[in-house]
A protein has these predicted regions:
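Short aromatic/hydrophobic contact patches that present stacked aromatics
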Residues: 9-11, 47, 78-80
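Core-facing hydrophobic residues within beta-strands of well-ordered domains
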Residues: 4-7, 76
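Vicinal oxygen chelate
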Residues: 16-18, 71-107
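Conserved beta-strand in the GNAT
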Residues: 57-59
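Core segments of cupin and vicinal oxygen chelate
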Residues: 12-55, 95
């Protein structure tokens, strides 16, 4: 069996780089570890951390293909972050004009 130790990082392709960068850094407070513009790909690569732990690799591309947005579609459904209070976190996001779903617990 492969001995996994932890999740190293999650790669996300965004459609609006500046908006996504602002969301992860200014709204969620992730720290920028490294930001690189890759001329050959006309693409940014942004490495982000929570508390010095590298967790998200954010990419931008000129015209990425759309993915289904239905919750039941195959692929990454959501990211979940640990916070002290889910309700307060939801209010904070809404106050920063971030669209959120109602809080629910999977059975």
């Amino acid at each position: 069996m492969l001995k996994l130790q932890a999740v190293h990082h999650i790669a996300i392709i965004c459609t609006d780089y500046e908006k996504s960068k602002r969301f992860y850094t200014e709204i969620l407070g992730l720290e920028v570890i490294r930001e690189v513009y890759r001329e050959a790909r006309q693409s940014y690569k942004l490495d982000l951390a929570i508390g010095k732990q590298y967790v998200i690799e954010l990419f931008s591309f000129p015209s990425p293909p759309a993915r289904p947005s239905r919750p039941e579609a195959a692929g990454l459904r959501h990211l979940a972050f640990a916070v002290p209070c889910v309700e307060e976190g939801k209010k904070y996001l809404e106050a920063n004009e971030i669209r959120v779903e109602e809080i629910r617990v999977d059975e």
